[in-house]
A protein has these predicted regions:
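Gram-negative bacterial Sec-dependent N-terminal signal peptides
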Residues: 24-25, 29-32
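Sec/Tat signal peptide C-region and signal peptidase I cleavage site
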Residues: 32-38
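Bacterial N-terminal signal peptides that target proteins for export
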Residues: 10-23
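Transmembrane beta-barrel domains of Gram-negative outer membranes and organellar outer membranes
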Residues: 38-278
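Short, Lys/Arg-enriched N-terminal segments with co-localized hydrophobic residues
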Residues: 1-12
Length: 278
């Protein structure tokens, strides 16, 4: 017996709901039982809100997007996002951030097969001063690269590069800022060039029990097709220690304020971040 697309969707939604409820219960228990952590844990929670903090981390971010095409298809993306800071002088770091997507996409129209595989890798290099500015601002800038690592049907099949930058400020538990990049393709057999701007304004608040509430958008403007894709994400995260290792769990939802025709309407997110403080 082969499950229909509707039965698959219902099963996936039930699984997602169970996952969300379980995580929320774990967070509630952690909040009720959380002991006072030392100052270094408070600093760790703060660094988690900083995309260019000097902190080795491995986030595993799962995204379920629903409502694609006339078949209301689902797309699942696991973003593997290791972050590696390197000290290059007494005053400067370079922060290397990768996004390695693993994708399962149902066919959004009848007759189009489901696809599973690797997406194109994006790698960013942020050169950042170790100390904030006199006004408390943290910033970094450098190049970003697009590698055509994806499997057929999930890749632009283009090499790309461009500039990237981030600026943020942290005060009284609040973190706010903007991460941006622009990628132009310069080689590759893909039929359509890549010419895209990515904008991620973000604001977050971390409580004294290391619970973080975050609101952001992950907006992309495709200059080739004159199209916006604007998911608005609302997320809650909890920092815990499990077996002595600091781990952050995050859950959230998103709504697409603007999107190309046939793209998803809404989605869910669950992420686990493994931290390796020095």
């Amino acid at each position: 017996y082969v499950l229909s697309k509707e039965e698959k969707r219902m099963t996936q939604m039930k699984t997602s709901k169970t996952l969300l409820i379980t995580l929320l219960m774990l967070m509630a228990l952690a909040l009720m039982a959380a002991p006072l952590w030392a100052q270094d844990e408070a600093e760790l929670a703060k660094k988690l809100q900083n995309p260019i903090a000097s902190l080795i981390s491995v986030p595993l971010q799962s995204n379920w997007d629903f409502g694609r095409g006339p078949e209301n298809a689902m797309r699942y993306t696991l973003n593997i996002q290791p972050v590696i800071p390197i000290s290059i002088s007494n005053d400067w770091n370079v922060i290397i951030r990768q996004i390695v997507p693993v994708i399962y996409a149902e066919g959004p129209v009848k007759g189009l097969d489901d696809r599973t595989g690797l997406g194109d890798i994006v790698q960013s290099f942020f050169f950042s001063p170790k100390a904030p500015t006199s006004g408390g601002w943290i910033w970094g800038a450098g190049p970003v690269f697009l590698y055509p690592s994806g499997t057929d049907g999930l890749s632009a099949r283009k090499w790309g590069a461009g500039p990237t930058a981030v600026v943020l400020k942290q005060e009284s538990g609040w973190t706010y800022g903007l991460l941006a990049n622009h990628i132009w393709s310069f080689s590759g057999p893909g039929q359509q060039d890549v010419n895209a701007t990515f904008l991620q304004p973000f604001v977050g608040f971390t409580t004294k029990t290391y619970t973080t509430f975050t609101l952001n958008t992950e907006s992309t403007y495709d200059w080739e097709n004159s199209e916006w894709r604007v998911p608005v994400n609302l997320m809650v995260a909890q920092l815990l220690k499990i077996g002595g290792m600091p781990i952050q769990f995050q859950v959230g939802g998103r709504w697409f304020a603007e999107k190309p025709e046939g793209e998803a309407d809404w989605g869910l997110r669950f992420a686990v971040t493994f931290l390796f403080p020095k």
